[in-house]
Amino acid sequence: MGAGFGPLGRRAFLMGAGALLATGGAGAPAQATGLPAPAGGGWLATAGMGEGFAAIGLDGTFASVAEAPSADRLHGVEPSPTGPLAVAVGRRPGRIALVFDRQNGRPVSRFAPGAGRVFSGHGRFTADGALFLTNEIERPPEGARAMGRGVVAVRDVAGGFVIRAEWTSGGDGPHDLMRSGTALVVANGGIEPNTPEARDAEATGSGIALLDPLTGAVRAEGRLPADLASLSLRHLSRDGQGGTVVAAQDLLKDGEARPLLFRIAADGALAAFAAPDEAWRGLRGYVGSVAHDPSGRLVACASPRGNRVAVWEASGRYLGAVPLTDGC
């Protein structure tokens, strides 16, 4: 991470749980153990503030040190790797993305999605900070209960975040995106659970697309088997050595034990992490955040519905879960 605040939101709690399990094992008591401050000196998050919303900067003790207010609900927040700016992207159906100074919270500018589209909550800077990529969703026809096609908008930061190129996301309803190794990984969530589009639906149409990070060409795609078609692939995390995972949410609320964490292979193939059935059921079909620890050896999933954080070794061995009320 560069200077200033690193990207985390409430993922800090995931790392605290990961450290706890790594130190004490799956049966360790859920006690606060202290969390080392990130290399950048703090965290970034989005939150409800009074009657509105804000992007906020937190120090190593999670005290708020910068607040950028917004009338629109925000979701993912991403710091520039080369300066003090950060961008918080509106939650679907997002109308704005907020550019702000993460050192003092001062709003710098706002920008809108492309014509006929909405933001879906996430964007990423390129490594040199020159471009900002946003996942956007085309608005479906009026009255249609469907999720629109996905577009990755490539934006020129110095030019005021104007769109310079548009790529297909490789699917419908993209949510998260992330550069990992030599690919730009896009989680096309398809139909999002707990939305009007999801009513009576049994399959999301979700998948993973691996794009060329320079041209946007789709190199590979990954789909779930038919028995997991109700899952929406939503959030990504990488281990720093080219390994990437994706976490899911389930359309169905039938109590079945479906895996919600998958490893993404270089050809896009998806392999489920292992866990006992009761562990999957304990997440209640919903993972709101996924993150690796700084070493890349642990990966954790937070479920606000299950009120817990589940942790695995990155190799796939399930370690256990710790309670965390409404942790996401």
Feature locations, PLM:
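N-terminal secretory signal peptides and thylakoid transit peptides that target proteins
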Residues: 1-20
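Residue-level detector of Asp-centered blade-edge/turn motifs that repeat once per structural unit
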Residues: 81-82, 127-128, 179-181, 239-241, ...
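Short, conserved, GDST-rich strand-edge loop motifs in beta-rich repeat architectures
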Residues: 135-147, 186-204, 247-258
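Repeated scaffold domains used in trafficking and secretory/extracellular systems
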Residues: 72-79, 118-124, 172-178, 230-235, ...
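Asp-box/WD-like beta-propeller blade repeats and closely related beta-sheet repeat scaffolds
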Residues: 114-124, 134-178
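Beta-propeller blade signature
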Residues: 149-157, 203-213, 259-267
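Blade-loop segments of beta-propeller domains
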Residues: 68-79, 83-99, 105-125
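Surface loop/turn motifs at the tips and blade-to-blade linkers of beta-strand repeat domains
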Residues: 67-71, 112-115, 166-170, 223-228, ...
